[in-house]
Amino acid sequence: MKARLGPIALLAGLLSTPAVAQDPQLSQFYASPMYLNPALTGNTYQDRLQLNYRLQWAGIPPGFETYAVGWDHRAAQVNSGVGVMVMHDRAGSNGLSFTQASAAYSYEARIDRKRAMRGGLRLGYTQRSFDPDNFLFADQVIRDNASTSLESGLIERVSYFDVSAGGLYFTEAFWAGFSVNHLNRPDQSLQSDGEARLPMRTSVHLGHRIPLDGLSVGRSRTELTLAAHYKAQGKWDQLDVGGYLHLEQVSFGLWYRGLPGIKAYAPGYPNDDAVILMAGFETDRQWTFIYSYDITVSWLARSSGGAHELSVRYEWPRRTKNRKAKIVPCPKF
């Protein structure tokens, strides 16, 4: 019966404690720009296709998996970006999952030739579901592990619309942005007589690109990028801080995630999550492949197995030297 206690706790938390619900997180957060901030939609010279995969807690089979695919386009003639994205997240082997399809739009306003601001909006349609056959309910335990539950009032599938927005200020070398997700606080409850409003997720991110070969930003092929990303949802918050080094077509990154000494989840459980190692390879400025591994440093370190993450990006070649596309915001892994 011990093997089934995890599903009991997971379902109990899902149904009765909505404040702890968290969105999927990506260590390579800039590798999924529309998910990070809709203002980053179309932050490329042309079209872009992005694929993301994350396996979290691989040491607790089958782990938690997140898949995402996105496409966006920069319409420089109207100072805009448009894109679409699909994300699927599965929690363990218990059939608890969510799938979201969304569309994003961004608009760019130039301050001068070297500075600009962008605003973005993302509208999504989400479906959350679970398979009750994979859970053990309290009434089954009471009835000597009965094969079926008498539990009533559960909804196996719930759907809702979701609204996110964000803003960005940027130059060729510096950027600072914010985003707010779930502005409409949709109800994600899986109980027919309950309510579980999804907490808003806020994000603040900034960074700086430093050329190391004497060339200007944008022309340099050897540069250091330093960045930080703070995110909060309900009672949960974390800070990612680190950087990555570009050496021609190869990149290496090192990050830390947590808020040690500043905040604890509970007495004896500090907000100390992971050290992230990252490596990537770029081919002729079109294909980019990035792999990262989260080394868990929290109390789960011995059993979690860390997290593996892979991102693949393809950017269509730049067709014209459009003056409106002189600067492109945000770094690229």
Question: What positions do the PLM features span?
Answer:
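Bacterial N-terminal signal peptides
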Residues: I8-S16
